[in-house]
């Protein structure tokens, strides 16, 4: 019989810390390419971008946790890690509040980044926040359709790597777009593997992911 975690541990698990590598690696790759090109690293933009990316990832994870619970897709027979809302460790309202709080912290990081990088960062930041909510928190979640991999490729590859490079150099180059493409493919592959694991449960609950359609 599984033992339920305490409240702090429940929040820790709900944030899904293992997924943070997927959101932080694009920031590091973009910064590494910028370092190669410019010979320097701007540490404050790097740290703000890393924390902002992590908070968006955590907020998206929490929206996913409560969204899947409310839509009935997190059933007792699902494979993979146990989910905080579905298991009753945390209330749906509390998890949703945690998601918005995480997005608010990401927004605060974005204020500094906008001061440094200007209007392009406004577009990147707002699009990233909207996408994080829409992935599973919106009325028609992206994760419930066949475009999840495309979404992840764009935001974890092109946007995150390119944006991190831009924060360091205030320019863009073909080389960083190539690096962004490679990182995006890797991130999309993570979603593909995850959806393959959840194939049977997704099919029963009406999630038409690319794996289910194929």
What are these regions (language model features)?
Residues 9, 18-22, 44-48, 97-98, ...:
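Alpha-helical transmembrane segments of integral membrane proteins
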Residues 1-44, 48, 139-140, 152:
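Topogenic membrane-insertion module of multi-pass membrane proteins
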Residues 21-30, 150-165, 211-214:
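Small-residue-rich segments of transmembrane alpha-helices in multi-pass membrane proteins
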Residues 63-103, 109, 188-214:
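Solvent-exposed interhelical
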């Amino acid at each position: 019989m599984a033992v339920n975690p305490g409240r702090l541990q429940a929040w820790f698990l709900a944030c899904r810390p293992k997924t943070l590598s997927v959101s932080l690696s694009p920031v590091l790759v973009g910064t590494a390419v910028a370092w190669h090109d410019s010979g320097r690293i701007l540490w404050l933009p790097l740290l703000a971008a890393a924390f902002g990316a992590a908070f968006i990832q955590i907020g998206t994870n929490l929206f996913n946790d409560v969204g899947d619970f409310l839509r009935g897709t997190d059933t007792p027979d699902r494979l993979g890690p146990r989910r905080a809302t579905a298991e009753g460790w945390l209330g749906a309202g509390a998890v949703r509040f945690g998601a918005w709080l995480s997005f608010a912290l990401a927004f605060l990081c974005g204020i500094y980044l906008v001061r440094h990088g200007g209007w392009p960062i406004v577009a990147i930041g707002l699009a990233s926040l909207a996408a994080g909510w829409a992935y599973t928190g919106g009325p028609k979640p992206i994760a419930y359709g066949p475009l999840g991999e495309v979404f992840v490729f764009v935001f974890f590859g092109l946007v995150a790597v390119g944006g991190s490079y831009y924060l360091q150099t205030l320019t863009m180059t073909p080389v960083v777009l190539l690096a962004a493409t490679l990182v995006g493919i890797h991130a999309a592959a993570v979603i593909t593997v995850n959806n393959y694991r959840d194939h049977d449960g997704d099919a029963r609950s009406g999630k038409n992911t690319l794996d289910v359609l194929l």
